[in-house]
Amino acid sequence: MGRRSKSRALSVWMNGERVGDWRRPAAGGQEFLYAESWLSSPAARPISLSLPLRPSREPYRTGVEAFFDNLLPDNRQIRERIQRRFRTASIGAFDLLQEIGRDCVGALQLLPEDHSPVNVKQITGERLTTDGVAELLTRSLGSTFAREESLEDTFRISLAGAQEKTALLFREGVWHRPTHTTPTTHILKLPLGTNPQGIDLSTSVENEWLCSQIVRAYGIEVAQCWMEAFGEHKTLIVERFDRRLASDGTWYLRLPQEDLCQATSTSPGLKYESDGGPGIGDIMELLLGSEQAAKDRRDFMRTQFVCWMLAAIDGHAKNFSVFLLPRGAYKLTPRYDILSAYPVLGHGRGKLSPEKIKMAMAVHGKNRHYRWKEICARHWLETAKRCGFGEMKTIIQDVIARTPAVIQQVRAVVPAGFPAQIADSILGGISTRAEQITVELSG
């Protein structure tokens, strides 16, 4: 059972500076107001492209809930587990984030209105053994506390997405549970298991690791990651690109960023283009305003094409992000959360039909095309043309030319004991796609 919400306002902080206040007025709704001190700070920047700095300090009332909602898992079951664990009034963004908003994606910390972060420029944490990490992962899957664990001692972090995960501090080769305001530096992702449709995704750790190697080999910047086991828990460890050690080595900075649902004021429930979320054209238009627009637009289209080659069909707007720079500037972050459908393609129980699977964002011909198997090179060229982007054919030719070397390079780093079905299906899949595109382009 939930409890009544304790607060009608949370203070929003970034690296020890107060950014503003997130409020629930008595009349209803939500609002966000930038702090006057933040507007005059050398570090000032908006918390979102959808909530620009306002010198007038007029509060925002639209788009506020969508922004903060996107800081949380969009999986209802995970939200309900957080609700039970922290005994919150609801699974709404405000109620959950007042409990777990101390270490969010990006740079934000959410604290009670009358609190401020302490010891920001220090690194503190509780050292963890391998068994300690395993115990923490086990506990993260539960909905209740260990008897000796109090609410005050509980590790409170918020990670968006639909997957079971937690985050820790990794420093000088040792794992720590950060304390006070020290941020986490690495995300630990557990296997997805079997989804509600009966699709076995228990090898998602190996799948995502392999996809990251492939994407990097194609020349795309992607989050660094590795695989590691903690007791019974197979884990993908992802280095956070929204964290950076300060130049003096004494503390970690939180780097401001947001996903493209936040940037476009899109609710996480509408993250897919077919549901009303941003599509390729919307994002290419947004990237025209990037600090490095030409590079970001080129990298985004290259990523889209490579993900299609990979049958990585879940590339919705939450799986792309931008760094937020001073005074409203921004640029694309590295890629992340890329998972191939090749290992589960087929017909029958527990399989995804290749004829039915859809990409998260459509490409264009005479009509919109979502179905993965129907998409051809000409659709990519037409989509790029509509976006005012003239480099798509060069990108396609380069990706196809690189594919044999990419396969060879990635096979060379696949570790012993890696599931052969995962490696063979994904690497074989991109090889087949490359051959098909070669035939189409030469026809």
Model-derived features: positions:
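Phosphate/dinucleotide-binding and metal-coordinating scaffold of catalytic cores
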Residues: M1-A317, S321-G443
